[in-house]
Amino acid sequence: MKTTHRIYFKNSADMNELKDKSINLVVTSPPYPMVEIWDRLFSELNPKIEETLIDEEDGLRSYNLMHEELEKVWHEVDRVTAPGGVVIINIGDATRKIGKKFQLYPNHVRTIDFFFDRGYQVLPFIIWRKQSNKPTKFMGSGMLPPNAYVTHEHEYILIFRKEGPRQFKTEEERKLRRESAYFWEERNQWFSDVWTDLTGVSQRLNHKNLRKRAAAYPFELAYRLINMYSIMGDWVLDPFLGTGTTMIAAACAGRNSIGYELDHNFKDLIESRINETLKLSNEIVMRRINDHIEFIREKNGKYYSENYKFKVTTRQEQDIRLYYPRTYKKIKNNEFEFFYQEVNPKKERQSKLNI
C-alpha cells in the first residue's frame, strides 16, 4: 500500500490545485475569530478588521468580517468535498472585552449556519473539554454576584456530511471499508459526544513568528477522526495545516492527504514531524492491538479476526487490517510518499496473543 501527501504554502481560499468533489474527508482547525492571537492574521487578510477592532465599541463588525474571511475557505471546502464526504471543524467560541462590553462570540454557531445553509447534514457534534488549571481562569467579579462569568473550558468538533451517506458501489470499496473497521471498544470511546481524555497541545516552537501563530490539536484527536470518518486510501484535506498534525495522522492511518498553510515558516517543522511518522505509526498501531487484546481477555469475544486470529466482539471487526508505514520518500518539493506493511502482532508480540 502507498499513500501520497502534498503541502501547498498558500491561502486556502483558492485551492485551484484540487478538482471538484475530490476530497473524502476534511479535518481542520481554523484561526478562531475574536481570539486575540489571531487578530494580526485576520487583519492581514482584511485591513478593515484592524480598524474595527480599534475604532468600534462592540466587536460584532469585527466578528462578521473575520468569519467572512473563513467562509472564503469554506466555499472552497464545499467545492472539493465529494458527495458523501465529511467535513470536520474543530473550533472554539471566543470571550472578549471590546471597549466596555464583554461577551461571548459564538464561532461554532456561525460555522454551523454556513454549512446548514448549503444543504449539509449537521451531524451530532463533539464537545472537547479542555480543562484549565490557570489561577486566573475565573472572569468577571470573582466571588461577588451577579457579574461573574462562567469559565470557558471546551471547544467544538463540528461534523457535517455532504449529500447524505456515502455509497460504496464496488466490491473493492466495500472490502476497504471492512478492512478499515475499528474495534468495538474504540467505537464506544470515540463516538461519545464529550471527549475529556485529550489535552491541548502546548507548543514549544523556536521561531518567534511560529510561537505567535501556532495552535495545534493533539495527534490523537486527528487520528481518531480520520479513522472514524474515512477508509484506507481516502483523500484527507486540512486547509489550515499549521504544524502538520492532520497530515501525520492521515499517514499513520493509511490515508492520502493534502494540506494548505499560509505561513512558510512552518515548512521545516512539518518536514521534521514527517520524519518521525514511521516510529509514531508503529507505536500507535501496536498500542491499538495490545489495548484490544487486554480488553478482549475479559470480554471474551464471540468472533475471530480473519487476519490476526485474535477474538473480536462483533462480525464487523473480523476483516480489520492494520498497516504502518515502513519507509517514505520525498518525491518532489512539498510532496511525500509513504510505503506500508501490514502489522504482524503474532510475530511482534507473541506473548500477547495467548487468549
Swiss-Prot record:
Gene it is expressed from: mthZIM
One Pfam family named in its UniProt record: N6_N4_Mtase
Entry keywords, A to Z: DNA-binding, Methyltransferase, Plasmid, Restriction system, S-adenosyl-L-methionine, Transferase
Protein name: Type II methyltransferase M.MthZI
Molecular function in Gene Ontology: DNA binding; N-methyltransferase activity; site-specific DNA-methyltransferase (adenine-specific) activity; site-specific DNA-methyltransferase (cytosine-N4-specific) activity
Catalytic activity of the protein: a 2'-deoxycytidine in DNA + S-adenosyl-L-methionine = an N(4)-methyl-2'-deoxycytidine in DNA + S-adenosyl-L-homocysteine + H(+)
GO cellular component annotations of the record: cytoplasm
Similarity remark: Belongs to the N(4)/N(6)-methyltransferase family. N(4) subfamily.
A biological process term (GO) from this entry: methylation
Lineage summary: Archaea, Methanobacteriati, Methanobacteriota, Methanomada group, Methanobacteria
Entry annotated with the keyword RNA-binding: no
Enzyme class: transferase
Entry EC number(s): 2.1.1.113
PROSITE patterns found in the cross-reference section: N4_MTASE (PS00093)
Stored Gene3D superfamilies: Vaccinia Virus protein VP39
Residues passing through the membrane, by range: none
